[in-house]
A protein has these predicted regions:
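Sec-dependent N-terminal signal peptides
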Residues: 5-15
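Phosphate-group recognition and catalysis centered on beta-loop-alpha active-site segments
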Residues: 8, 18-159
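N-terminal secretory signal peptides that target proteins for export/translocation
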Residues: 1-2
Length: 159
């Protein structure tokens, strides 16, 4: 009888832990909610759509251009343009699949400011540690200046 009570108590404890854990699970829209009409990866529309379905966060990728400007894009080379060796103007002239131009980080954050979803900012791995450090300094300053520190989380796969 004691064994049954112990097993029952253990099972109930595990079930309660599972319920509590499920309540803490959050959804992050990877590159925004982009697999929808009128959206594209890392687009401002994808950010807005992630917010509209109440995602905990919307992940997006940031690069530093050759002229030291911050842009939002996943790939190091997109539509033939290499992010790190091209200017902001060259990068932002790229048209995304939904018709938007590739956004600057400033444009992306300007839109995010009026939304509720958290910002999951991925700094892409750059060619040198110096470039990454410069990108980090600019990103942190921009986030702070816009008052978005409490809504922003950072990730990177930098070496």
């Amino acid at each position: 009888m004691k064994l049954k009570k112990l097993l029952f108590a253990s099972a109930m404890s595990l079930a309660a832990c599972g319920i509590l854990q499920a309540q803490n699970t959050q959804v992050i829209a990877h590159r925004g909610f982009w697999k929808t009409d009128g959206s594209a990866q890392n687009s401002i529309a994808a950010l807005v759509k992630a917010d509209s379905i109440h995602c905990y966060g919307s992940e997006f990728d940031v690069w530093l251009t050759a002229d030291n400007k911050l842009i939002v894009d996943h790939d190091g080379v997109f539509k033939g343009v290499r992010m790190e060796t091209s200017t902001e103007k060259e990068c932002t002239s790229i048209t995304l699949d939904n018709g938007e131009n590739l956004p600057t980080l400033q444009q992306y954050l300007d839109k995010a400011k009026g939304l509720k979803t958290r910002l999951i900012l991925e700094l892409k791995a750059h060619k040198t540690p110096e470039r990454e450090t410069l990108a980090v300094e600019q990103i942190v300053k921009m986030i702070k200046d816009m008052g978005l520190e409490k809504r922003t989380e950072y990730i990177t796969f930098s070496r």
